[in-house]
Amino acid sequence: MNTLVLKIDAILSKHLKKQLASYTISSQNTYVAFAAKKNGVTVLLYKSGKLVLQGNGANALAQELNLPVAKTVFEASNNSQDIPIIGSDEVGNGSYFGGIAVVASFVDPKDHSFLKKLGVDDSKKLSDKTIQQIAPLLEKQIPHQSLLLSPKKYNELVGKSKPYNAISIKVALHNQAIFLLLQKGIQPKQIVIDAFTSQSNYEKHLKKEKNHFPNPLTFQEKAESHYLAVAVSSIIARNLFLDNLDQLGQDLGYQLPSGAGSASDKVASQLLAAYGMSSLEYSAKLHFANTHKAQALLTK
């Protein structure tokens, strides 16, 4: 996916809206004055005058619309690493036990050598042991914002008749992590989120959040493989999640597994037998199917 960002004046804005009048779409982002989608390219015109085109055909559409691409456009391809970037990622959403860790990190091109020496560019190949060794080094060197939503708080917020669902809670966490990082004076050229939902769905849930920022977002699947900033966030978040999982286990006197497989069912049933439902409310995400499976194991 390519992202083109440029500044346009009132005359060009009016011309753009006229050209894309039959392609308009809704946007829940309060900073967006006009939104459209044509040929698979999303067009967002912000109230500030900033125009963003996102999609593989962004360049072609910009030319079709006679936009001043050559002079004022900034282009970021999937593997663009020569600009300062904020990358955001989360860990723990697929695990029954443990909370959700979300981290936003700011990586400048001058950090690349340091990160590659640590093996950050191959973050998916790193073992948990290695992650626990290098995460403290990243936390010390790279500006970042970490958030951890405990299982207990997660269960208070997520579920039927509660404020959030499994997607909207991640939107809230990513948005808050990025917002808080920007408050530190960070000035990225691009903000990338490891995509867990569509941009339109993200913006729908974002509407109810208190804090907002005008910077456009890039959504990329498996973003940690394309952006060092996202890889850094993935590593720090994984370490934060593992620390939380270990602490919860120590509190209960059980080794809590990561993931949502049969091992989680077994440990959950043991916790139910030992302490009752309150132990799962404290350590696990109750709306997962593992809860019912654990209860069923007790009846056998």
UniProtKB/Swiss-Prot annotation:
Cofactor binding: number and manner: Manganese or magnesium. Binds 1 divalent metal ion per monomer in the absence of substrate. May bind a second metal ion after substrate binding.
Pfam families linked: DUF3378, RNase_HII
Function: Endonuclease that specifically degrades the RNA of RNA-DNA hybrids.
Biological source species: Streptococcus pyogenes serotype M12 (strain MGAS2096)
Cofactor dependence: Mn(2+); Mg(2+)
EC number(s) stated in the UniProt entry for this protein: 3.1.26.4
Name this protein carries in UniProt: Ribonuclease HIII
Subcellular location: Cytoplasm
GO BP term (any one): DNA replication, removal of RNA primer
Catalytic class of the enzyme: hydrolase
Domain RNase H type-2, first and last residues per copy: 83-300
UniProt key word Nuclease: yes
Gene responsible for this protein: rnhC
Sequence similarity: Belongs to the RNase HII family. RnhC subfamily.
Annotated keywords: Cytoplasm, Endonuclease, Hydrolase, Magnesium, Metal-binding, Nuclease
Cytoplasm listed as a keyword: yes
Catalyzed reaction equations: Endonucleolytic cleavage to 5'-phosphomonoester
GO MF, one example: RNA-DNA hybrid ribonuclease activity
Any single GO CC term annotated in Swiss-Prot or TrEMBL for this entry: ribonuclease H2 complex
